[in-house]
């Protein structure tokens, strides 16, 4: 047996490898009654849902999920459970065998009837979607039998699915029990194909509702954006006619408006991005079920395209308005800030020019003072020389004191001036 080389493994290798197998569809056999509930949940509620499913498994003496479990499938005897933990929501799917003989003749029995009521009422989060799906092992089932007790006639939709191997009926209405309803005629589909089709139908309803979460946010954002756009238009007009004294106040208003726009953007951007992703998933799942028109009925794809287009466009338009407004506010802020900075630079240059003029005046005054200083110092030194000449006269100094003073004046003046200039240069070199 050859030696196995085991290089260092990436810490996420197994997790990434198994992601392709995450949440696989399970093989199913008709007839089935399926109840699908989607609970919108924050991080704490998603964690609580793991504890909630663990409590149910504990009551049935089954193995509990570990802290990293994000989905599980379990047969609990009275019903089969499928639990999935998503980024924003938790899905609970309950399955039981369905009675086919009298289906359509009276109110159908939901799989939810087999689930413990108290445990069901305590599901963490808020219910976003609840759907009853009945899977029947027949090829055809008259729509007249469905509209009497199962679906609403005025909103009935139907199509063939799985390339003609099955039929699906729904009305996209919330009935008295709080659930929407769907009927799937499985015909002779294999168990795995049926499992894939059921999962896609459930995901269409789940992602449709998740995508529409962006619609209330878009409507609320539209009112805020309309106010911000009016405010920006007023600011643009005010900036155009503003003088220098008005600009700081305008810049403050513009800065506060930018903060408001960015706050709104931060609050809704992730919601709009998520809605866009969910809308794409709805499109993909509708394509996956491979439906075609049935007896002139409107298909699920046609209904979704007609009814969701407006909501989708509203969310996309709100996101584009936010981006455009943010860019406009940023551009106007930069322009006004540049204008203020240019005027500040001009003011600084004027101030520097004034300072230069003052410095020139100070230099002139300093030169005048230096001249007076030379005269004063020369006067005192010549006075001393005169006294010395008078004393020297008695000792034989040949010149009179007046002549000595006259000769000393230019010499003393030049010496004093040179000394002051030398001191002046020495001080300026130090600074």
Feature map (PLM): residue ranges:
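N-terminal pre-transmembrane cytosolic regions of membrane proteins
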Residues: 1-129, 134
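Structural beta-strand/beta-sheet cores of well-ordered domains, especially the beta-sheet scaffolds
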Residues: 33-35, 88-90, 178-180, 313, ...
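Alpha-helical transmembrane anchor segments
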Residues: 360-431
């Amino acid at each position: 047996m050859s030696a196995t080389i085991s290089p260092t493994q990436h810490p996420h290798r197994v997790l990434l490898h198994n992601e392709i197998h995450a949440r696989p569809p399970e093989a199913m056999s008709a007839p089935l009654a399926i109840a699908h509930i989607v609970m919108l949940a924050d991080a704490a509620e998603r964690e609580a849902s793991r504890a909630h499913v663990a409590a149910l498994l504990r009551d049935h003496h089954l193995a509990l999920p570990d802290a990293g479990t994000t989905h599980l499938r379990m047969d609990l005897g009275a019903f089969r459970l499928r639990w999935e933990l998503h980024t924003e929501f938790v899905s609970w799917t309950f399955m039981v065998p369905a009675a086919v003989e009298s289906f359509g003749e009276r109110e159908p029995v939901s799989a939810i009837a087999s689930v413990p009521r108290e445990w069901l009422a305590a599901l963490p989060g808020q219910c976003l979607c609840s759907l009853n799906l009945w899977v029947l092992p027949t090829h055809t089932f008259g729509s007249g039998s469905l509209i009497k007790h199962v679906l609403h006639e005025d909103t009935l939709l139907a199509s063939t699915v799985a390339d003609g191997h099955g039929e699906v009926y729904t009305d996209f209405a919330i009935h008295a029990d709080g659930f929407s309803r769907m009927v799937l005629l499985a015909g002779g589909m294999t168990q795995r194909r049926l499992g894939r089709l059921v999962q896609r139908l459930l995901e269409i309803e789940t992602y449709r509702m998740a995508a529409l979460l962006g619609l209330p946010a878009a409507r609320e954002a539209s009112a805020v954006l309309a106010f911000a756009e009016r405010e920006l238009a007023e600011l643009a007009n005010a900036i155009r006619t503003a003088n220098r004294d008005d600009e700081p106040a305008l810049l403050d208003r513009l800065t506060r408006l930018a903060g408001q726009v960015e706050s709104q953007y931060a609050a809704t951007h992730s919601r709009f991005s998520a809605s866009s992703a969910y809308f794409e998933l709805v499109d993909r799942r509708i394509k996956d079920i491979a439906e075609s028109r049935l007896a002139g009925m409107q298909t699920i794809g046609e209904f979704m395209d007609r009814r969701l287009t407006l909501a989708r466009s509203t969310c996309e338009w709100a996101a584009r308005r936010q981006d455009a407004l943010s860019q406009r506010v940023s551009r106007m802020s930069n322009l006004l800030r540049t204008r203020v900075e240019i005027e500040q630079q001009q003011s600084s240059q004027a101030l520097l020019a004034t300072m230069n003029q003052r410095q020139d005046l100070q230099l002139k005054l300093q030169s005048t003072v230096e001249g007076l200083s030379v005269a004063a110092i020369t006067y005192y030194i010549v006075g001393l020389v005169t006294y010395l000449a008078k004393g020297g006269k008695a000792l034989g100094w040949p010149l009179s004191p007046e002549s000595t003073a006259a000769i000393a004046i230019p010499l003393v003046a030049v010496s004093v001036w040179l000394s002051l200039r030398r001191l002046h240069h020495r001080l300026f070199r130090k600074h």
